[in-house]
Amino acid sequence: MNKNSSQHSFLRTIILVSTFGGLLFGYDTGVINGALPFMAEADQLNLTALTEGMVASSLLLGAAIGAVFGGRLSDYNGRRKNILILAVLFFAATLGCTLAPNVSVMVISRFLLGLAVGGASVTVPAYLAEMSPAESRGRMVTQNELMIVTGQLLAFTCNAVIGNVLGDTSHAWRYMLVIAALPAVFLFFGMLKVPESPRWLVSKGRKEDALHVLRRIRNEEKAKSELAEVESAFHKEAEMEQAAFKDLAVPWVRRIVFIGIGIAVVQQLTGVNSIMYYGTQILKDAGFETKAALIGNIANGVISVLATFVGIWLLGKVGRRPMLMTGLIGTTAVLLLIGVLSVVLKGSPALPYVVLSLTVTFLAFQQGAVSPVTWLMLSEIFPLRLRGLGMGVTVFCLWIVNFLVGFTFPVLLANIGLSATFFIFVLLGIASVIFVKRFLPETKGLSLEQLEQNFRAYEKTDRNSAEAKVSG
């Protein structure tokens, strides 16, 4: 094996191992959909509507907090060490959920699981972005998105299989939940074999260690030039002293934070998680029987995985802006069709099949365009010293909106119906398209350090034009 192929092979190992954090993210957010009905039984946790909501949403609340603290901890401990800690937390919280004797233990365990999910949603993309060469960063970072949707598909499939095979066993939900312990073990032992991010090593003054890591994943010339680029960017950022929340108020950084929060919120306002969490309920409302709805939900998981493959391929060919715009226009148009046809075809035997085909189309746009661009851009727009903190803040906003969508969707569905609920998401989708068109910069093909220079230059241009207007 020559040196180049050895470097590529090691880079592939790094991607595979670290993205098991994404697999856990996907499985743990998707599994609750099928586990709740079994968990709610009188001889199990005997859930009421309120406690059911608490069990489902406690993970999302934990994820919001985990995103903020996970970002700060990854800046302090390093990306690799942070992922190792998260793997232990994934494992312990999974066992807590699996063995929960009552609602209180379940809610606390789900909250702890959420901390791990939120921490992984920040740390893994940042680690991948910092290990990636600029020309293939898009494909590498979105491997994590692929693992997230694979985890969700795995959850939907396991729910269906266990629900049918062990459906008469009241503790079937415990088998659904415990499966997540296996990838947590793989993540922990796998991360022991991969190196720390060279960019983080530079930030801690460990230049020789950083060069050693870069030589394992780049050729000699690229390793040295990339190290020089990283050092140059870090020295510029060092003027800001230690990263703190007040640094996010620096004008050029404030613009990045605004764009980052906007991207995160836009990704959730499509309503994607209303389908991922309540897909079975949507299909039942459209007219399917429960078993048919469960099978339909697997179709949603399959299309998510296939579309993510397409999205990863597209990121190497198409700019971030046009890809996100196309995805948002597509999701908004599909939701409009669901809203209209749910009224026009109400009571028709064709309606459930129409709604299923439209949810599949919606997820093709979402997972093939919107989600890959979201996670990639969040990982690449922030400067090195603020990357963990910046991603933490933006992903915190993503999880809070996720929590609000997940919490309000079933309430809206029960009170105003399927059509009106989706019309609300259509209006939010139109607002999202306007935001992207107005504010989103193109980042394709630029190194992380070049992106930072562009943001700094934008601030100078903005300031100069403002001064010219005043003097004029």
Task: Indicate residue ranges for each PLM-predicted region.
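Alpha-helical transmembrane bundle of multi-pass membrane proteins
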Residues: 1-215, 237-472
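Short, well-structured alpha-helical segments
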Residues: 223-235, 358
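Short helix/loop segments within enzyme catalytic domains
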Residues: 217-219
